[in-house]
Amino acid sequence: MNANPKFLAATAEVDAAAVAPLPKSRKVYETGSRPDIRVPFREISQDDTPTMFGGERNPPLTVYDTSGPYTDPDVRIDIRQGLPALRKAWIEERGDTELLAGPTSEYGKSRLTDPKLTAMRFDLQRPPRRAKAGANVSQMHYARRGIVTPEMEFVAIRENLRREQYLETLRASGPDGEKLARRLQRQHPGQSFGAAIPTIITPEFVRDEVARGRAIIPANINHPEVEPMAIGRNFLVKINANIGNSAVSSGIGEEVEKMTWAIRWGGDTVMDLSTGKHIHETREWIVRNSPVPIGTVPIYQALEKVDGKAEELTWEIFRDTLIEQAEQGVDYFTIHAGVRLPFIPMTADRMTGIVSRGGSIMAKWCLAHHKESFLYERFEEICEIMKAYDVSFSLGDGLRPGSGYDANDEAQFAELKTLGELTQVAWKHDVQVMIEGPGHVPMQMIKENMELQLEHCHEAPFYTLGPLTTDIAPGYDHITSGIGAALIGWYGTAMLCYVTPKEHLGLPNKKDVKDGIITYKIAAHAADLAKGHPGAAIRDNALSKARFEFRWDDQFNLGLDPDTAKEFHDETLPKDSMKVAHFCSMCGPHFCSMKITQDVRDYAASQGVAEQEALQKGMQEKAVEFVKKGAEIYHQT
């Protein structure tokens, strides 16, 4: 089906699971230089450490939060109304945009006036906005003029994760607070491969990174609901979640539900890859209810407009589609402008040919007309559209390898060089750019991808799908790709596109979305640790401390997926009393290494000696006991 026949705008409601509070967590905000810059975080409370000396306080830990207002109990969520337009004042006060009378794309107009769509249409009351004649409204344009926008300040506060406040709270937590702060912020030196990540992210640093093209802030002026975020090598590694219906599966309600589910678990951006009949309406519902940037592949919808016949695509249809989606508020477009006619023969000897949907569409068009791609030839005209709405480019890798066999071949790298050339064209227009990457790449070949991308694309952010490191595990490609994602994230990729267990097999459901998100949150965080991102180890250290102290609930809640952690624990130790037990089901009460170590520490404290001395003393006592019992290894019982 193309849209759920039961979906009606009048009865649409938020997924209850998306607004349920996470365990022992609360939404907190940090206010910037003006009261309407309120940056959201999730604060996880912890139990005190149970010690023989009366307990040690473990202050709440702040973590990055992508869930938007959905997890704020003070905000009433009604998806029929959409989210609050938090950037509205920022956009208006710049004075470089104007409200339109309504949609200006032909397709947008036709959908708005089609009475058959009334029952499912999102009832948007405000008209779209566009740059005034001659104006450029991109964050890169402001950055290059030396302007620090509220969006840039928002990003800076968000990236710092209230780390300094947390450390100050640790220092003030008790007599050993200073020692505790030192322990919890301890971090192994990283290898950043040239990334220059400051200890404190300032708004000026964000501005400079955006001006240089090393970072982007995807934030369409028609998506005022978005909470600004940055994608760049010198920021936290981000992840994207793909959703979208098809001609045979899912509908509007399910896709909005997937979006809210994805951001609950940590999706930094969401791509709507819908290919069904009601693409326009589905996208409107998603954008109006999304606090994270939304990306699309406009060629998919353009293809639907010509009944799936790639050879019938025209520049005029594609241009109208870009304007339609820009006026809805899409924050970044994947555009496969690097798929050029001369490159197509390079794929002839591949094992898996051209696997990108967008790439194959444009390859077919080029061959049908024996002409250069209109995306390539009209690229400057595309830039004019992008800068009028501040839509960022995600330059698509239409010739990415679809198997390890095809990795790092001539076609892939020819396209990459072209994407670098197009990046400089876009930057001439002050349009923000990131570069898409593979794909399927064996581990030993991954680093070359990152090095060549930095060289050819002038440090524009890299955004990769995995890469998958082996092709033998259908049903487990979230794992095969998570391995590659962690590696390429370490080498410098700015955003990782998740892969779900359903990759190559079918469209993901909610469970698949969550599995993909958690896998990629692990990969992104592992990359941050390996790069030596300041403060990246604090959460690891806090969880390790909770684990050693047998604070089971804190172990669950500090993790990426508290629900699953608690579920696994409860399968073998279900009683509440087991949440304070000093062992788990793996080793049991008598063989727990952490319990034994804790016993040594307690013994040392009671004897007034150091831990090493306590170990020696304990072993001497046991030796005497062994001799007294007859020096026999085994005894009759």
UniProtKB/Swiss-Prot annotation:
The keyword Zinc applies. Binds 1 [4Fe-4S] cluster per subunit. The cluster is coordinated with 3 cysteines and an exchangeable S-adenosyl-L-methionine. Its EC number is 4.1.99.17. It comes from the Bacteria. Pathway: Cofactor biosynthesis; thiamine diphosphate biosynthesis. Its cofactor is [4Fe-4S] cluster. Keywords: 4Fe-4S, Iron, Iron-sulfur, Lyase, Metal-binding, S-adenosyl-L-methionine, Thiamine biosynthesis, Zinc. It is an enzyme of class 4 (lyase). Substrate binds at residues 242, 271, 300, 336, 356-358, 397-400, 436, 463. GO terms for biological process: thiamine biosynthetic process; thiamine diphosphate biosynthetic process. It catalyses: 5-amino-1-(5-phospho-beta-D-ribosyl)imidazole + S-adenosyl-L-methionine = 4-amino-2-methyl-5-(phosphooxymethyl)pyrimidine + CO + 5'-deoxyadenosine + formate + L-methionine + 3 H(+). The keyword Zinc applies. Gene3D superfamilies: 6.10.250.620, Radical SAM ThiC family, central domain. Zn(2+) binds at residues 440, 504. [4Fe-4S] cluster binds at residues 584, 587, 592. GO terms for molecular function: 4 iron, 4 sulfur cluster binding; carbon-carbon lyase activity; zinc ion binding. GO terms for cellular component: cytosol. Homodimer. Belongs to the ThiC family. Catalyzes the synthesis of the hydroxymethylpyrimidine phosphate (HMP-P) moiety of thiamine from aminoimidazole ribotide (AIR) in a radical S-adenosyl-L-methionine (SAM)-dependent reaction. This is Phosphomethylpyrimidine synthase. It comes from Bordetella petrii (strain ATCC BAA-461 / DSM 12804 / CCUG 43448). The gene is thiC.
